[in-house]
Amino acid sequence: MHYSTSPLGEAGRTGEMQFIEMMQAGVLVSMSIDNVTAERCDCFACMHMLQTVNKHRTGGKFKLTTKKLVEMATIDGARDLGFDKVTGSLTPGKRADIILVRTRSPHMGSDGDAYDALVQLAQPSDVALVMVDGRILHRNGEFTALDYDKLLADGAQSVAALKAKAKWS
């Protein structure tokens, strides 16, 4: 059995997320983002929110490690979707799906624990590189594999067409 939690959306809508009980019962719990129009598309914030919700809900009785939170956002998500044979971990033979995160900034701290830094301190602006299947798609704040201006123009054109079709101004 699998369950994907969307912490940023669920925390504001449904009250208590009982994912700890699910994990204890053997359910594979992964992390997701439900709706990019209603919440931030920020995996770091999702991990941090899940950690915070867990601390408040369980009073710290169930320690959800930052390593486990990163696994929930990576390999557990791939397992949940049935993609774990091709992605979700850095393993020979799998696709090279990688993000590189800048750690040399004042807000990232200096204690040296990579999992703690990713979950508790990292922000989307810290992502220096995104590689999907070995192709660099984003580097230093710039998309490298798509025409961003064309994407925005196509999106605006689609919205205008939908509004016209719906007779909505």
Where are these regions (language model features)?
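A cross-family glycoside hydrolase active-site/sugar-binding cleft signature
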Residues: 2-6, 32-34
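Generic beta-structure capping elements
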Residues: 3-4, 50-52, 133
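Helical hairpin unit composed of two closely spaced alpha helices linked by a short loop
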Residues: 10-13
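His/Asp/Glu-enriched, well-ordered alpha-helical/loop segment
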Residues: 18-106, 121-123
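Active-site microenvironment of metallo-dependent hydrolases
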Residues: 71-169
